[in-house]
């Protein structure tokens, strides 16, 4: 019974992240939605790892790897966003045309 609740929560978080990523106009909000998507994927990895083979920690270890990857992605993304904000004075997606100077 708990398995279905966790999967429903994961699908709900993934849907919120996809919706926010599609409708977001701010780059910081899009980055946060991307983190939400990665966290819902981690929830699925840990749930299925516990369901199918609780003695081996393959899903848990892979989830830790995804957390490290998400932290690196957030650090790089925020540094790029701070550079864009410093140069363009805006973090809106529709105003960030890098082809024109």
Swiss-Prot record:
Enzyme Commission number, as recorded: 7.1.1.-
One of the GO biological process terms: ATP synthesis coupled electron transport
Membrane topology per record: Multi-pass membrane protein
Stored InterPro entries: NADH_UbQ_OxRdtase_chain4L/K, NUOK/Mnh_C1-like
Any one GO MF annotation of this record: quinone binding
Residues spanning the membrane: 2-22, 32-52, 61-81
Broad class of where this protein is predominantly found: plastid
Keyword Protein biosynthesis: no
Any single GO CC term annotated in Swiss-Prot or TrEMBL for this entry: plastid
Entry keywords, A to Z: Chloroplast, Membrane, NAD, NADP, Plastid, Plastoquinone, Quinone, Thylakoid, Translocase, Transmembrane, Transmembrane helix, Transport
Keyword Transcription found: no
Reaction(s) catalysed by this chain's protein: a plastoquinone + NADH + (n+1) H(+)(in) = a plastoquinol + NAD(+) + n H(+)(out); a plastoquinone + NADPH + (n+1) H(+)(in) = a plastoquinol + NADP(+) + n H(+)(out)
Stated role: NDH shuttles electrons from NAD(P)H:plastoquinone, via FMN and iron-sulfur (Fe-S) centers, to quinones in the photosynthetic chain and possibly in a chloroplast respiratory chain. The immediate electron acceptor for the enzyme in this species is believed to be plastoquinone. Couples the redox reaction to proton translocation, and thus conserves the redox energy in a proton gradient.
Family, as annotated: Belongs to the complex I subunit 4L family.
Quaternary state and interactors: NDH is composed of at least 16 different subunits, 5 of which are encoded in the nucleus.
Name of this chain's protein: NAD(P)H-quinone oxidoreductase subunit 4L, chloroplastic
Source organism per UniProt: Oryza sativa subsp. japonica
Gene of this entry: ndhE
């Amino acid at each position: 019974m708990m398995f279905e609740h966790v999967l429903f929560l994961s699908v709900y978080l993934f849907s919120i992240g996809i919706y926010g990523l599609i409708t977001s106009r701010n780059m910081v909000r899009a980055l946060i939605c991307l983190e939400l998507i990665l966290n819902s994927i981690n929830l699925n990895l840990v749930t299925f790892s516990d369901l199918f083979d609780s003695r081996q920690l393959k899903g848990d270890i892979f989830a830790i790897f995804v957390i490290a990857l998400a932290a690196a992605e957030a650090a790089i993304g925020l540094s790029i966003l701070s550079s864009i904000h410093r140069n363009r004075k805006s973090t809106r997606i529709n105003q960030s045309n890098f082809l024109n100077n």
